[in-house]
A protein has these predicted regions:
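HIT superfamily nucleotide-processing domains
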Residues: 1-138
Length: 138
């Protein structure tokens, strides 16, 4: 896509701090470092998000993300890693090109916070019915 920031980076029109590159995948440092070493992994071809990406390409991106996370722990001495991808604006996706954040974690309060809490406004959920609905779609 001509107006996609990540497509422009993948095509070399916008410079980046490249970490890894092959025919299908590019990994580079996020210009907005949440923690030291925060890396983005993208397919070079445009796909809107994780859910729209063909499995072969998604698997290649995940393999690269896994390797980068391992290196961040080994060589940057991170204590852990968050690997995540937001799908759609409502889930926090701001650039509509599939990308995986690989965020090394050094200590609590290091600049990144991901919290999940039980939503008490959803009482009396019928979990078997919800599970059945999802199962039917698989």
């Amino acid at each position: 896509m001509s107006d996609c920031l990540f497509c422009k980076i993948a095509q070399g029109e916008i410079p980046c701090q490249k970490i890894y590159e092959d025919d299908d995948v590019l990994a580079f440092l996020d210009i907005s470092q949440t923690t030291v070493g925060h890396t983005l992994v993208i397919p070079k071809k445009h796909f809107d998000n994780f859910l729209a990406t063909p499995k072969e390409i998604m698997h290649k991106c995940m393999d690269v993300a896994q390797t980068i996370g391992q290196v961040q722990i080994r060589d940057l001495h991170a204590k852990g890693v968050n690997i995540l991808s937001n799908c759609y604006k409502e889930a926090g996706q701001t650039i509509m090109h599939f990308h995986i954040h690989v965020i090394p974690r050094y200590y609590e309060g290091d600049g990144f916070k991901l919290e999940m809490h039980e939503n008490h406004e959803l009482p009396n959920l019928n979990l078997p019915a919800i599970a059945s609905s999802i199962k039917k779609g698989i």
